[in-house]
Every structure is written in C-alpha cells, then in structure tokens.
Design a protein with these regions (language model features):
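Acidic (Asp/Glu)-rich catalytic clusters
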Residues: 9, 71-76, 122-126, 179-183
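Active-site mouth loops of central-metabolism enzymes
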Residues: 23-35, 100-115, 142-143
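Beta/alpha (TIM)-barrel catalytic core signal, keyed to glycine-rich beta->alpha loops juxtaposed to Asp/Glu
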Residues: 138-331
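Short, acidic/polar
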Residues: 32-45, 110-124, 171-178
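N-terminal small/glycine-rich loop or linker at the start of catalytic domains
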Residues: 10-29, 84-104, 134
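Residues at the N-termini of beta-strands
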Residues: 16, 52, 129-132, 165, ...
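Active-site groove signature of glycoside hydrolases
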Residues: 122-141
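N-terminal binding-site loop/beta-alpha segment at the start of enzyme catalytic domains
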Residues: 1-80
C-alpha cells in the first residue's frame, strides 16, 4: 500500500496517517491535559515522520490551537497544518450549533466570520499561513450564509497566500457538488471507520468525480477498536461514548469477537491491533487519509509502526470480509 498520498489536486503530499489534536484541547469533553506532555507528543510525531496535524478553534475553545502553535513553532516548514472555520462562541448567530465548554457555540460561514476565524487561528498557531483550511460544520440553510460567499472568501484567502488548500467537513454529496461548482475543493473530513463506512457509498463517488481527497476521523471508534476495551468496560453516565451505538453491549460483544479473530494477524505481522485497524481503514478506500488522535508519545510511536506494515493481499481480503460480515450483523 502506498505510504504517501497527495491531497486533492494540490502538490501537498503526506503519509496517510495524520495526528488529530482535539483531545489535547482538554476541557469537559476530554478532561484535563498536561500541555507539556501534549507538546512532547507532537514533537515525537514530527520526529517520526508524521506530517499532517489537524486542529480547530473550538477544540478546547482555542486551547488546542495554542498548544499546537507552541509545539510546531520550530518545525513549521516540516509539517502540514489544518484548522477550521465556521464555529463561533464570541457572538450569537441565527444558527445555533451546541453548548461546548459551557459556552453557546454558533455556526457562521460569512466572509467576515471566516476572515476573523483565520486571523485568530494564525495568532494562536503562531504562523502566517494554514496549509488546509476546513469549513467545520455547514449551515443547514444556505440563504443565511450563501455558499457562494463562503467559497469566494476561501478562494480569495488562497490567492492571498494565507491558506494553501480548501477543505470542508461534515458534508453531503449535494454540498460537495455545490462547493465544486464554485471552485476547487481539495479535501473533506468525515467520520469513517471499519464499523461505519457510510461515506463509501454516499460521498466517495462525488469525491472521485471532482478529485477531492477524504480524511477520516474516529477510525478507532473512540477507542473501541484498540483492543483495550472489554465487555466489562464500564462507561460513566456522562461519557460521550454512551451515544455511540457501537459501544452498546450487544454490538460491543459482536465487535470484540471479531477483534479476537485478528490475533493471529497481529502475531504474524508483529504489530498491535490498532496498527491493523488503521492499516485496514487506510486500505479500504482509494487514497484515504486517516486521522489518529494521540495524547502521549507512546501512542504516536505505536501509530507510526502502521506505516511500515505491508499486509499480504489474502490477509487483507480475509480481514475485510470479517468486518463486512460484522457490519451486516450490527446494522
């Protein structure tokens, strides 16, 4: 499997594994974090060849970007940095998103909001350009913030050299088509895992049509596919994973049974279960980029081992069939 992959029609190339930094933003969603440890984790990733680092203003209400900015300052030219626009907590809009970190967060993809979001991100990240700039969440009513205005602003920022590529997150096929009718969309970021492959049917065809890359988040289903979870694992009542249908007891039992069947492969390839899952995920769609979160250097060290794997086609096919059968059983 090809280790390096191009992003859309750009000249940007990166190993298929990137590092997600939502967790290092801390807060009520992820709990308290050690910023010094987070910085060491990012530095470890850079030293081990991870190129793409993804963040967003709303992760920890600016905290993730601040930590990432400190960590990459001496290595900015060696990495690709993506962040996002479109979620506001400083002012109210007619489009409420959700409460995050005790604040009301709203969607806003107007020209003024995008430019303000970018300048705030540049300051927190201590850089003068962003490699990939995503619209984080789309507004359901484009009469409120016309997509023409949004895309025109992004294209202008690209001309100004403040961003290098345009991305969109949490989209539909119709929205991708609309973006692409207005200019070049380079990449989308969507939830995707071996358990949740809905974008393969719904979004992949339109992405291939317009040469748009896909970056997957939550490939390990919030830790469920790491091998560290058992049927006896108990989540606290406030744990967000209670809302993940795959964590439900019945589904979890079937999932853990399949993971157990992968043990011979982890032994054959001398790798962790996470390595296998990330590899299988990256191999499941053409040119897929996989975003893996990490809070400790040892997690980075393990994730990077995936890039040295080279699974035999027969093994890849057998494991893919196991997950296809699993998906059919837990629908």
């Amino acid at each position: 499997m090809q280790k390096e992959r191009t992003i859309g029609t750009t000249t940007l190339k990166t190993p298929y594994i990137g590092m997600g930094t939502w967790a290092i933003g801390g807060g009520t969603w992820w709990g308290e974090n050690d910023d010094a440890l987070s910085i060491r984790t990012i530095e470890e990733a850079i030293d081990r060849g991870i190129v793409w680092f993804d963040t967003a203003p709303v992760y920890g209400i600016g905290h993730s970007e601040n930590v990432v900015g400190k960590a990459i300052k001496q290595n900015r030219s060696r990495i690709l940095l993506s962040t996002k626009c479109g979620l506001e907590w400083d002012h109210e809009t007619p489009c409420f998103h959700k409460v995050m970190e005790g604040r009301n967060v709203y969607r806003d993809l107007s020209a003024a909001a995008i430019r303000k979001n970018l300048e705030d991100s540049l300051r927190r990240l201590q850089t003068d350009y962003i490699d990939i700039y995503y619209t984080h969440w789309q507004t359901p009513d484009f009469s409120l913030y016309p997509l023409e205005e949004t895309m025109d602003t992004l294209l202008q920022l690209k001309k100004e050299g403040k961003i290098r590529a345009i991305g969109a997150s949490n989209v539909t096929a119709k929205i991708i088509e609309k973006y692409c009718s207005l200019g070049q969309l380079d990449v989308i970021q969507e939830k995707y895992s071996l358990l949740d492959t809905h974008i393969a049917d719904k979004l992949l065809p339109v992405c291939q049509k317009h040469h748009v890359s896909i970056q997957a988040y939550s490939p390990l289903e919030q830790g469920l596919l790491t091998g560290k979870v058992t049927q006896d694992t108990v989540l606290s009542p406030t744990d967000v994973r209670n809302k993940n249908k795959f964590w439900a007891q019945k589904s979890r039992l079937n999932i853990l049974d399949v993971l157990q069947k992968l043990t011979p492969y982890t032994e054959k390839y001398s790798c962790s279960l996470s390595n296998l899952i990330i590899y299988l995920t990256a191999a499941s769609l053409p040119d897929l980029h996989v975003l893996c979160g990490a809070r400790k250097p040892e997690q980075i060290i393990d994730n990077v081992k995936t890039l040295s794997l080279n699974l035999e086609e027969a093994d890849l096919s057998e494991m893919s069939q196991l997950f296809e059968q699993l998906r059919n059983s837990i629908r």
